[in-house]
Structures are given as C-alpha cells and as structure tokens.
C-alpha cells in the first residue's frame, strides 16, 4: 500500500533515512533531526513531500509496518516552461526489496508528476549502486551522462553567500 506520509510518520521516516545513509555509506552526512524533517514536510512552509509504502494487508494508519519511502519536491524546467518532480530519496528496507514496493512508489510519483503537469521526473543515483541502476533502466529511465552534479555546502556555501 502506498500513501502520502503524515506527521505521525516522521519518526519512521527519520529512521529509514538513517538506514538509507548507512546503505549508501554516508552515515557521517546524516545530521538532520527528526524535528527539522517534520517541519520541512508539514510545517508552515513545506519544502518537500513523502510517500510511504506499507507491508501488504496492513492498516497503515494504526499498526501497519512502513517498509519504504520516497521523498520528493518540485523543481522547474525553463526549457519546458513546466514544473518537474525531483526524487530526493527512495528507500525500501533490504528484507522487503523485490516485492514491488520500489516500483509502486515510483509509479505513484509518476502519477503525481502527470497529475501536476510536470514535464519530467528526475533523480540521481550513486555510480556504484548497480542494482538501483538496473532497476531504473528496467522502468524506462535513462541516465543523463552528459550532466554532472555540483553541490555547495558548509563553508563554501557560506563563503559564496557572504561575497560582497
């Protein structure tokens, strides 16, 4: 079962994000708090949204076991003059993989993108994550090999912001 995450899901989402960081060998970068996640998902200014996957037959609002999630937000294509959907994180517990949860999460996101008039649906994947790359290709997604990803964080971000 796939559904929109609600405020009560924040603790499990935070725990799953921690597991994702471990899987991606990025534990040292997981510094976000449960409180900040909840504020950004459900506060006055919502920066992102999330879907959760619950195990089959479970009542997700009472005792269902959340086995995966997708966290996403809108971006914008100036070339298309249309919004886009960006998948920040997709994670399914290792023991629950190959049961269709990832595909159902992505299908739900594709439907959201179409319903909202998005011109594209994008995400990134670590180069070493071959199982995910094969999965995405099987869905019909294509890698954007001609594009690179850049990021400013910490001191570099502050330094650029402080330039006179």
Describe the function of each predicted region.
Residues 1-15, 26:
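A short beta-loop-alpha structural element at the N-terminal edge
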Residues 72-79:
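A conserved beta-strand-loop-helix scaffold within acyl/acetyltransferase catalytic domains
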Residues 114-124:
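Conserved GNAT acetyl-CoA-binding A-motif
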Residues 96, 100-108:
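Conserved acetyl-CoA pyrophosphate-binding loop and the N-cap/start of the following alpha-helix
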């Amino acid at each position: 079962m796939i559904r929109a995450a609600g405020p009560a899901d924040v603790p499990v989402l935070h725990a799953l994000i921690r597991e994702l960081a471990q899987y991606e060998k990025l534990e040292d970068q997981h510094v976000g708090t449960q409180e900040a996640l909840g504020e950004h998902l459900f506060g006055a200014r919502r920066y992102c949204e999330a879907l959760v996957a619950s195990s089959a037959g479970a009542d997700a609002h009472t005792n269902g076991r959340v086995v995966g999630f997708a966290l996403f937000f809108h971006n914008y294509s100036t070339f298309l003059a249309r919004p886009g959907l960006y998948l920040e994180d997709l994670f399914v517990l290792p023991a629950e993989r190959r049961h269709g949860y990832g595909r159902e999460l992505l299908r739900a996101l594709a439907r959201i993108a179409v319903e909202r008039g998005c011109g594209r649906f994008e995400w990134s994947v670590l180069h070493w994550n071959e199982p995910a790359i094969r999965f995405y290709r099987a869905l019909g997604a294509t890698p954007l090999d001609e594009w690179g990803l850049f990021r400013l964080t910490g001191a570099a971000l502050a330094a650029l912001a402080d330039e006179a």
